[in-house]
């Protein structure tokens, strides 16, 4: 009896990875994920964008499925591969990456609001801009305190 092939390809890729023994600490190369997702290699420079987009879509679906259906966090090792984070490290990893991402986005928002040509604004728009800057500053302060608390909790050793 033959086994059923799942569609789209990322569903089959998840099944194959689990059947091959994917577990915490396992590393999977980007090339292997491309093979499992049946993403055709680019034939020329113009085709690279298609390849990257297809592969990114497939990897994102695999990561989401592994996390939500199997409680396995698959993350990039920044060396061309992906690794399944061990459960005891998952909270700290999630908090650390989340805090960094929030910080980056807060900085982008603050800069966009701060570097506005206020001399070209109406009085009403200038007041809105000043109010937004004040609120963003207040929010950044609150986030800083909460982020520190989160990091402490995530890295606290159990007694």
Regions found by a protein language model. Name each.
Residues 1-25:
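Short alpha-helical segments that sit at the start of domains
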Residues 23-49:
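Short acidic, hydrophobic short linear motifs in intrinsically disordered regions
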Residues 49-65:
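Short amphipathic alpha-helical interaction segments
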Residues 63, 67-77:
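A short, conserved structural fragment
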Residues 75-86:
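Minor-groove-contacting beta-hairpin "wing" of winged helix-turn-helix DNA-binding domains
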Residues 89-112:
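Short, amphipathic alpha-helical interaction segments positioned at domain boundaries
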Residues 110-159:
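Exposed, interaction-prone assembly regions rather than primary DNA-binding/catalytic cores
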């Amino acid at each position: 009896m033959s086994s059923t092939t799942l569609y789209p390809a990322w569903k089959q890729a998840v099944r194959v990875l689990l059947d091959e023994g994917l577990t915490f600490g396992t590393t999977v190369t980007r090339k292997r994920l491309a093979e499992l997702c049946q993403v055709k290699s680019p034939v020329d420079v113009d085709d690279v964008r298609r390849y990257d987009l297809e592969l990114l879509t497939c990897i994102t679906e695999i990561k989401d499925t592994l996390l939500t259906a199997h409680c396995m966090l698959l993350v990039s090792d920044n060396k061309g591969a992906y690794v399944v984070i061990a459960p005891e490290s998952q909270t700290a990893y999630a908090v650390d990456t989340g805090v960094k991402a929030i910080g980056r986005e807060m900085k982008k928002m603050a800069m966009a609001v701060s570097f506005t040509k206020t001399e070209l604004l109406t009085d009403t728009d200038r007041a809105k801009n000043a109010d937004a800057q004040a609120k963003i500053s207040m929010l950044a302060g609150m986030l800083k305190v909460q982020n520190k608390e989160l990091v402490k909790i995530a890295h606290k050793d159990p007694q």
